[in-house]
């Protein structure tokens, strides 16, 4: 793990097979009990794409939420002790209008989170479309902050590709 003042990057050099689609997920969250987290995700509406498997430092699983949002859940054999960040990043999730409500409902249930705001007319400049508006939902939970950007998917580069940011 590489830690910067504003985030971490995980790098692994696996010498064993890696279950597909591990590695294609947009984000990951550290959990304290893998079995409970997977069960909670499943009962909250997630599909378990990759059941828990051992990695060099713990266990991982991949779940998918409404809208196709793939998320890694991971657990460490020895709990990590990271220095506090100078700035806390937000997880950015892009979803369609068709999936937004289901995604937010299910993820909030899983994370015991709270919808902090739901702005139906957020400024389009935030997604590279300055003359328009879009729906932006902000969620907070024990996993941190998440911004859900509800779009039609027709975004100019690099919007829609970033997975983290800062308010």
Language model features by range: what are they?
Residues 1-9, 43, 51-65, 93-145:
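Core segments of cupin and vicinal oxygen chelate
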Residues 2-7, 14-42, 59-64, 88-98, ...:
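Vicinal oxygen chelate
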Residues 10-12, 72, 147-149:
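Conserved beta-strand in the GNAT
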Residues 14-18, 75-78, 120, 124, ...:
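ER-lumen resident redox/N-glycosylation machinery signature
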Residues 47:
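Residue-level detector of anion-binding/catalytic polar loops
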Residues 61-81:
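Short, structured interface segments
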Residues 83-85:
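Short, low-complexity N-terminal intrinsically disordered segments enriched in polar/charged residues
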């Amino acid at each position: 793990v590489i830690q910067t003042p504003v985030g971490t990057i995980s790098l692994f050099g696996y010498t064993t097979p890696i279950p597909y689609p591990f590695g294609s997920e947009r984000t990951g969250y550290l959990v304290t009990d893998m079995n409970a987290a997977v069960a909670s995700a499943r009962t909250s509406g997630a599909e378990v794409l990759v059941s828990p498997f051992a990695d060099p430092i713990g266990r991982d699983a991949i779940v998918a939420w409404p809208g196709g949002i793939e998320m890694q859940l991971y657990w460490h054999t020895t709990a990590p002790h990271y220095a506090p960040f100078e700035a806390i990043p937000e997880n950015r999730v892009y979803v369609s209008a068709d999936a937004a409500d289901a995604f937010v409902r299910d993820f909030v249930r899983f994370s015991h989170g709270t919808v902090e705001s739901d702005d139906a007319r957020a400024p389009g400049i935030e997604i590279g479309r300055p003359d328009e508006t879009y729906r932006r939902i902000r969620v907070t939970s024990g996993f941190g902050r998440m911004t859900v950007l509800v779009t039609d998917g027709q975004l100019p580069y690099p919007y829609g590709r970033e997975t983290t940011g800062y308010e």
